[in-house]
Design a protein with these regions (language model features):
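HIT superfamily nucleotide-processing domains
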Residues: 1-109
Length: 109
């Protein structure tokens, strides 16, 4: 039996809802698995976030097909950042400690 427990709304949920409505100013683009947003603070030029749509609590909450697409989108974002930023490599970070919803920090280095 599927657990129908409702996940708490997070800032990730709000950003995705705003992106869907065209109200999120930091949107870079829509990708198959979600949304790419500029990081609120550009501590490294080109820092972006990948937010899944629909929002899920963790990578492990995605089915195999959705998980594969999310990770492929993540790596394609990295490829694009290498091209436009001149970065040597890209750091990818999935934490979820502060906001308990899947999102990836994609940081050019």
């Amino acid at each position: 039996m599927k657990d129908n427990k409702v996940e708490p709304e997070t800032i990730i949920h709000r950003h995705v809802a705003d992106a869907r409505e065209g109200r999120e100013a930091r949107v870079v683009t829509r990708v198959y698995s979600g949304w790419v947003l500029f990081g609120q603070q550009q501590f490294v030029k080109g820092y972006v976030l990948l937010l899944p749509d629909p929002v899920v609590p963790s990578l492990n909450a995605l089915g195999q097909k959705e998980r594969t697409q999310f990770l492929l989108d993540m790596s394609r974002i990295g490829d694009a950042l290498i091209k436009v930023s001149g970065a040597i490599r890209i750091n990818y970070a999935i934490f979820g400690n502060v906001e308990p919803a899947l999102h990836v920090h994609v940081v050019p280095r």
